[in-house]
């Protein structure tokens, strides 16, 4: 399957109102062959990708790799989304990495993330969805979710690598991630492919697209009245 064209529409972190999902992939069904590809849970059990959003909508966030400090800090903010907010909108939040499944539990402990999480260690779903490899030079603006600078963040990642039980990058360091809104069934409502490590979607802009209340990520979770 040829990789679909990238979606270039961006939403700034300061946006108050976000248009309805659009782009060349939105409204098109996910190929059945992609939906059947397996992901692994924290126990190494295989689950068809499409089963994750068969019954309801899901925000699916593909991260670069579990040692990436940017991914770590982004997922730390995903962890702050109250489960009740997602339940009210009948939405599932899913993170997918591309490491061995053995790294899932330590990553969740590190970030405090307790929503659904899986891995695609062969990166087959990443490839079939057209996720990029390498860094595209593009201005992504200031992320509201990244707290560390390049030096301190890189040192943290290196320290985690050398002190971990297995010295590895917990995934391909050149792989980029992305965000999708999928389901129920194989419906694609929105897709964004990260052009570089800082090009992830501001979380509240994605939550607004699925009718989930905004979260104040500067402190503890709370509703933002707009």
Curated annotation (Swiss-Prot):
Expressed in gastric tissues. Belongs to the peroxiredoxin-like PRXL2 family. PRXL2C subfamily. May positively regulate ERK1/2 signaling and AKT1 activation leading to HIF1A up-regulation with an increased expression of glycolysis genes and enhanced glycolysis. This is Peroxiredoxin-like 2C. PANTHER family: PEROXIREDOXIN-LIKE 2C, PTHR28630. Disulfide bonds: none annotated. The gene is PRXL2C. It comes from Homo sapiens. GO terms for biological process: positive regulation of ERK1 and ERK2 cascade; positive regulation of glycolytic process.
């Amino acid at each position: 399957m040829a990789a679909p064209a990238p979606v270039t529409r961006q939403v700034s972190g300061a946006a108050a109102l976000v248009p309805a999902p659009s782009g060349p992939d939105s409204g098109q069904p996910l190929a059945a062959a992609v939906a059947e590809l397996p992901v692994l849970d924290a126990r190494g059990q295989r689950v068809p990708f499409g089963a994750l959003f068969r019954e309801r909508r899901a925000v699916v966030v593909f991260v670069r790799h579990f040692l990436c400090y940017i991914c770590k800090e982004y997922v730390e903010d995903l962890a702050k989304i109250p489960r009740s907010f997602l339940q009210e909108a009948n939405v599932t939040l899913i993170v997918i990495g591309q490491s061995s499944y053995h790294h899932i539990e330590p990553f969740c402990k590190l970030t405090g993330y307790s929503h659904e999480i899986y891995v695609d260690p062969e990166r087959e779903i990443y490839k079939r969805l057209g996720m990029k490899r390498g860094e595209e030079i593009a201005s992504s603006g200031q992320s509201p979710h990244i707290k560390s600078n390049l030096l301190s963040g890189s040192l943290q990642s290196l320290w985690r690598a050398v002190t971990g039980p297995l010295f590895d990058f917990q995934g391909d360091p050149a792989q980029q991630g992305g965000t999708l809104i999928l389901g129920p069934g194989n419906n694609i409502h929105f897709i964004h492919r990260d052009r570089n490590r800082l090009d992830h979607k501001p979380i509240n802009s994605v939550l607004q697209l699925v009718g989930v209340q905004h979260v104040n990520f500067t402190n503890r979770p709370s509703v933002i009245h707009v």
